[in-house]
């Protein structure tokens, strides 16, 4: 009987601690991401890229999140872009896209998108 009681107490303690923990991504995971929100964020990023002169060399960055993993596409941008700011914007978009995929139980073709050739 004591063993059963101890097991019960341990189970209750485990469930109490397991359910009370906070997720580091809880702010993002609690927000509902919609396609119009993603579209607006993408337009913001494209508009930011287009404010820079593209006469010099270009680079690319992985963009979007496929449900199977990996990027949906690659964005080309001029080397004159503030790379830190662009990376921050794209990382935020990619995280939102990943969350949207989870929320909508999205599926994809799982094809690997290759980066552009130089």
List PLM regions with ranges.
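Sec-dependent bacterial lipoprotein signal peptides
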Residues: 1-17
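Alpha-helical propensity feature that highlights long, continuous alpha-helices across diverse contexts
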Residues: 5-8, 21, 88, 95, ...
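Bacterial Sec-dependent N-terminal signal peptides
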Residues: 16-38
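Extracellular secreted precursors and ectodomains with disulfide-bonded cysteine-rich loops/domains
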Residues: 17, 52, 56, 66, ...
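Charged, low-complexity, helix-prone segments enriched in Lys/Glu/Asp/Gln
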Residues: 30-47, 89-103
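Extracytoplasmic/periplasm-facing segments of secreted or lipoprotein envelope proteins
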Residues: 34-68
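Mature extracytoplasmic domains of secretory-pathway proteins
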Residues: 57-98
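Short flanking/linker segments adjacent to small metal-binding domains or redox-active Cys/His motifs
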Residues: 100-118
